[in-house]
Amino acid sequence: MTIGIWILGDRLTTKQLSLSNNQSNKQQIPVIFIESSEYVKQHPYHRQKLVLVWSAMRHFAAELEADNWKVTYKIAADFATPLQDWLATNNITELQITTPCDRPFHNLIQSLDLNCEIKFLADNHFLWSKEEFITWANSRKRLLMEDFYREGRKRFNILMDGKKPLGGKWNYDKDNRKPPKKNLSTPSPLTFEPDAITQEVIDWIKQEKFSDYGRIEPFNWAVTRQQAQQVLTYFVQECLPQFGTYQDAMVTGEYTMWHSLISPYLNLGLLEPREIIDAVETAYYQRELPLNSVEGFIRQVMGWREYMHGIYHFQDENYSQSNWFEHHQPLPEFFGDASKTDMNCLHQTLTQVEETAYGHHIQRLMVLGNFALIAGISPQEIENWFHSAFIDAYDWVMQTNVIGMGQFADGGVLASKPYAASANYINKMSDYCGNCHYNKSDRTGDRACPFNFFYWDFLHRHHERLKSLGRMNLVLSHLKRISENEFGEISSLARKWWKNQQIS
Ligand code: FAD
Ligand code: SF4
């Protein structure tokens, strides 16, 4: 038997089993990387996403080569042609691949006509394997993230004081998520100058015109494990102490606040979840950092991220087509060009995404996702857009975050109520409304904020469905304060808004 290893573009780690199991034999084992331009044509990806993935692949391939692995790097239109050639040239009889996290890619590999056995090895890049998550989920009546997170804290003994949570509580969000104060002094994100490999990828993407979405330069992301570790160290040193307090705040021109910016690297395999959690927990003990920030951050990586991955595998393929509210509006043109909206919150957030391929969680959930939800945009259209636009997007993390959390299209598998809000929330958590063409307090009239008329129209339209959720009753009781006449005006503003939209 001759073994060959195919390294996938989102598993750039020597810890994956195909590499760690064969370490002692590395000089004899052929390893292949494939950049397929056909695959990336499926989505109009942000150009910085393409640069990140291909540059990180090229760097990782060079590192393996320097470590004496027998590396082949192919740039091709598809996957099958270079694979077949390489398998034949090296007489490979068993192709080892880390099981792809994304279902569509797993299906694609299984459909390839290859003249050898394919051995999928377990993906060890999460704290909970998908089988462990499914066992946990099958043992529960309800799938609450908070229950899962507590189970993880106990299982991996993180922030524990014996059998009790450190400080006596599991969750310190009461001290987190404050509105932004004026003149906050935020840390600048750590940036990296493109090296020769990255510059070559940038030039090639410009030349080949794989996508025209998003600014390609300046490109400041890390592209190697070593650089990603610097991002983690910088976060722990400079941002972690304040992370929790302003986790949900949004400020004009402040793209990253105290957020970690580690998701692109975690999702590519350049960082491991356990090393992040350990670095943060160690800093807590060594520097006596505020527990609200430390616990709040660990909950993101150990709770939310693992939970989203688990739910993706717990659900079947049909999850991606969920549409509980039966929303079918198309994607407005301004999602592809921020200059085409005069709603300041959307304009600021979409401009930022165009410039960096990044937005923090509340910008994604409460500005972009919230707008799509209350305006009635198709969950699949908005999911496609998120998948194209964000630097850290992959199918497993998109389905759960966009279809489930953002759009509530799964009818409550993942969240107990929809994340829907009016301008009131955006005004409280940001400074966007102060500079907007619209009036944040109006839900009718010439300057009515679209977040307001869409919000009330959403509640009114889906009143019966929302009633069944129980947790929406208080919100729904406010509908009584609005007269039928006013609802007529609200719904005509919503209809008029759609009539005036250019569709992308
Ligand atoms: P921080 O705020 O510093 O958080 C730390 C880490 O926690 C993140 O890096 C991430 O690894 C993890 N995390 C926190 N929440 C989640 C979550 N809900 N799901 C998965 N991981 C989480 N995350 C992605 O990795 N890729 C995506 O494409 C993506 N799309 C999203 C779309 C929507 C509509 C929403 C609501 C959330 C999405 N998220 C996605 C989750 C979250 O917003 C990002 O992980 C986070 O903003 C990344 O920035 P950061 O590294 O600075 O995160
Ligand atoms: Fe957004 Fe409305 Fe505030 Fe303008 S007024 S920034 S549209 S929420």
Show where each model-derived region lies.
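C-terminal catalytic domain of photolyase/cryptochrome flavoproteins
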Residues: 8-12, 249, 253-263, 268-504
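N-terminal beta-strand-loop-alpha-helix module at the start
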Residues: 1-74
